[in-house]
């Protein structure tokens, strides 16, 4: 059974639109936990467009489940993580011009730099996950980097047409299998909604789904605690069995 991590970045986006103090991600993290969230995820971007350093500091003190800090693989962010000591760090690609994270890390081309950062973080007792596309070469490079986890990018699945979605699902299923055979633990996220989450939650070996935008959108109608509860029910007991089909992309 997959667990549920709730991403609070969009709460901070609303706050930063007016540069004010509300809505407060720290307060809403508590409501998410009361709704059944198994963890809280925030992305501290280099441009600080939504989550701020102070948010992360306060969340570290108040989160009672798990705190997953998404961040770019930079010296500045590694130093912050070593100070804050979240329960997990997820290294993600970052571009200043993007609206949201657009794809997975290219671990293959960044292997040397990533190995050093991963060693620093895990040497301090902070498990590291790499946000990657479900491609064999990236998974193999992730394993060689020393990371203990990967988070599979589900954006292509979420954005696929009805006819293409089973093929994208098959890539995620096979990517999960490949990662586990390499000794990696597996999470997933990006673009998941109440309508498409169940096949991903049903994948054997999938440990946690990180979901934000769709939950915040529903929270506007039903409140955050209820929105999290509804998503938790889908993730905990998915009704749909996964489909099987296409092979891994970018075979090495």
Curated annotation (Swiss-Prot):
**CDD domains recorded for this chain?**
PNPsynthase
Enzyme nomenclature, EC number = 2.6.99.2
User: According to its UniProt record, in which pathway does this protein act?
Assistant: Cofactor biosynthesis; pyridoxine 5'-phosphate biosynthesis; pyridoxine 5'-phosphate from D-erythrose 4-phosphate: step 5/5
Question: Which residues does this entry assign to the site Transition state stabilizer?
Answer: 151
A GO biological process of this protein is:
pyridoxine biosynthetic process
Q: Summarize where 1-deoxy-D-xylulose 5-phosphate binds, as residue positions.
A: 9-10, 45, 50, 100
Instruction: Provide the active-site residues from the annotation.
Output: 43 (proton acceptor), 70 (proton acceptor), 190 (proton donor)
Task: Kindly state which keywords UniProt assigns to this record, in alphabetical order.
Answer: Cytoplasm, Pyridoxine biosynthesis, Transferase
Chain sites annotated for binding 3-amino-2-oxopropyl phosphate:
7, 18, 191, 212-213
NCBIfam families linked? pdxJ, PRK05265.1-1, PRK05265.1-3, PRK05265.1-5
The family annotation for this protein states: Belongs to the PNP synthase family.
- Put simply, this protein is called Pyridoxine 5'-phosphate synthase
């Amino acid at each position: 059974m997959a667990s549920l991590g709730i991403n609070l970045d969009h709460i901070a986006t609303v706050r930063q639109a007016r540069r004010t103090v509300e809505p407060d991600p720290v307060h809403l993290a508590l409501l998410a936990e009361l709704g059944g969230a198994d963890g809280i995820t925030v992305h501290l971007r280099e441009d600080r467009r939504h989550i701020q350093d102070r948010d992360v500091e306060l969340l570290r003190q108040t989160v009672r489940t798990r705190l997953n800090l998404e961040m770019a693989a930079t010296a500045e962010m590694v130093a912050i993580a070593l100070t804050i000591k979240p329960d997990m760090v997820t290294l993600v690609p970052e571009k200043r011009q993007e609206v949201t994270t657009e794809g997975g890390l290219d671990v293959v081309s960044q292997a040397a730099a990533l190995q050093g950062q991963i060693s620093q973080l895990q040497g301090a007792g902070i498990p590291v996950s790499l946000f990657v596309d479900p491609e064999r070469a990236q998974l193999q490079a992730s394993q060689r980097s020393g990371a203990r986890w990967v988070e599979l990018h589900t954006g292509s699945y979420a954005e696929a047409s009805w006819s293409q979605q089973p093929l994208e699902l098959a890539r995620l299923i096979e990517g999960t299998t490949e990662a586990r055979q390499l000794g990696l633990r597996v999470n997933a996220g990006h673009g998941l909604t109440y309508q498409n989450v169940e096949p991903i939650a049903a994948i054997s070996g999938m440990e946690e789904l990180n979901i934000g935008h769709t939950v915040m959108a529903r929270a506007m109608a039903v409140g955050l605690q209820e929105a999290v509860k509804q998503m938790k029910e889908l993730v905990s007991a998915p009704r749909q069995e996964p489909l099987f089909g296409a092979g891994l992309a970018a075979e090495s």
